[in-house]
C-alpha cells in the first residue's frame, strides 16, 4: 500500500478503497434481495434436489447435466440453518448461500490481491466482479454459477501464489478449489484443467530457465 508524506493513503489507494467499498455495498445489497421467495424452474429443481436424502440426491444428480457439489452445499447449509432457525424459508437460505461466494471473492480481493498489488488493483478486482451486468440476478440465483466462479477464481489466485512462493498451503488450496470447481459445473471443470495445465507448463518453463 502506498502512503503520502502526510501518512494518508495515496490517491490510487483511496480510489481502490472507494471501489472496494462500492463492491461491498453491492454484495450486502444482494443479501437484501434474498427475502423474496420467487424462483424459476431451474431453481425449483435445485430446491427439490436439496430436499432429497444424500443417496437419492447423488443418484438424481448423476442423471443431471451438472455435478452434485452445489446441491450438497445447499442441502448441508440449509439443514444446518434449520437447526437454529427451523421456520426460515429454505428458498431464502438457498439465495443467501448463492451470495456467499461473492463475499468470498471480496475476501480474496481484500487480502491476497491487496497485499500483492495494492488497494487500486484490489478495488478494481472487487468492483468489476460485483458490477457485472445483471449480476444482481446471479448473486441470489439458486444455482451453482457463483460457486463455480469462486472456485475457479480462487484456484487461479493460488496458482499465482504457487509460482511466487511455492508454499504447500497454496498447493493444497489450489488442489481443493480445482476439485471443487470440477464438481460444481462442467465449464468450471474445463477451466480447472486449463489451470492445472498452465501451472505445469509455467513450472516447467521456470525450472528450465533456472537450469540455463
Task: Describe each model-derived feature in a short phrase.
Residues 20-24, 96-116, 154:
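Transmembrane-helix motifs of polytopic, lipid-linked glycan transferases
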Residues 12-43:
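Transmembrane signal-anchor helices characteristic of membrane glycosylation enzymes that use polyprenol
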Residues 38-72, 76-84:
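Extracytosolic helix-loop segments that constitute the early lumenal/periplasmic catalytic or substrate-binding loops
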Residues 68, 72, 83-107:
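Loop-to-helix entry region of an early transmembrane alpha helix in multi-pass inner-membrane enzymes
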Residues 140-144:
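Short acidic/glycine- and proline-prone juxtamembrane loop motifs at membrane-interface regions
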Residues 125, 170-186, 191-192:
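Membrane-interface alpha helices of multi-pass inner-membrane proteins
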